[in-house]
Amino acid sequence: MKLAFLVHTSRDYEEVIEMINQLTKQGDHVFIMINDNDLRDKVAFVYTDYLRVHVSRTQEYAQEGDLSLARGTIIQMKEAIEKDDFDYFINLTDGMMPLKSRSEIVAFLSEHEGKDFYYDATADYDQVVLNKKSKKYYPFTNALDFPRNNFLRSLSKASGSFFSMLGIRRKSEE
């Protein structure tokens, strides 16, 4: 069974390297989006010749609270499908590692073949904080240059906070 781990991180160098090494140790692939430019370059350099590590370059940055993380994950999946035929994608957020061994993960996925699994983070996360972040309106995140342009990212955060103070929020049906 071919597994692809989709990761978004802004951790320090040692943690990122250790995570990648652990995830690729048993032959799995890692598609990683790193928010820090210097860290991204260091990791890309270290794994230049390692075919199982793919540092995201199409979208290099994702901001919490807007759709750039969802878009980045979809781009990672698209790039993964173009490289190989993966059976499952496992999405990990910053600092996460699988608690089960690869054989236990494969056995579980084989037993429940064709089903999707997800973890509802709202059970462990302060609902007020989550609602505040999800309702904040961040402009410019659909701009093609958003992931690479520090000015646009900063302007988006500042505008989001300003709009929030004015009571302008993202509309949601839920």
Predicted regions mapped to residue ranges:
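ER/Golgi luminal nucleotide-sugar-dependent glycosyltransferases, focusing on the catalytic module
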Residues: 1-174
